[in-house]
């Protein structure tokens, strides 16, 4: 009887261990993807927004990027997005964006930022908070939502 019980426990313990290891590997892989997605968004703000390096748009955004906050008449896709971002950020002679919060889950990253901008048209400095939501697939941003632009008076 003791031998049977020992054999049963041995099988039970060994049968559970690989599943736990698989769960740990899956969890580690998911965490790695989430961290890569967060790093992508941080880089977008540093390089594309703060430094106005628009040549990197092709490296960050999918060809079929869908801007859920597109202005009327804005073309969807990378070229339309590139034009809209270039024109929008071109309104500011000075620009500083600071990420206050970043949360990521799966293929989604959400951010809250503080913007300090100086308008090219009237040299007026404005400060406000916005929120952005991104969906990322295969290392490229496929969808973007944004809220909070009221502080610009547009």
Each model region followed by its residue ranges:
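Sec-dependent N-terminal signal peptides
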Residues: 4-12
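Short, surface-exposed coil-to-beta transition loops
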Residues: 96-97, 112, 126-131
């Amino acid at each position: 009887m003791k031998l049977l019980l020992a054999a049963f426990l041995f099988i039970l313990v060994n049968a559970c261990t690989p599943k736990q290891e698989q769960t740990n590997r899956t969890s580690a892989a998911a965490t790695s993807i989430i961290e890569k997605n967060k790093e992508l968004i941080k880089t977008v703000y540093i390089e594309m927004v703060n430094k106005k390096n628009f040549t990197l748009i092709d490296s960050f955004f999918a060809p079929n990027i869908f801007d859920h906050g597109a202005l009327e008449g804005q073309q969807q896709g990378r070229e339309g997005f590139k034009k809209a971002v270039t024109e929008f950020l071109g309104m500011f002679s000075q620009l500083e964006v600071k990420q206050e919060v970043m949360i990521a889950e799966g293929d989604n990253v959400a951010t809250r930022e503080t913007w300090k901008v100086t308008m090219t048209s009237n040299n007026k400095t404005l400060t406000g908070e916005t929120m952005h939501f991104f969906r990322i697939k295969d290392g490229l941003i496929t969808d973007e939502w944004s809220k909070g632009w009221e502080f610009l008076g547009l």
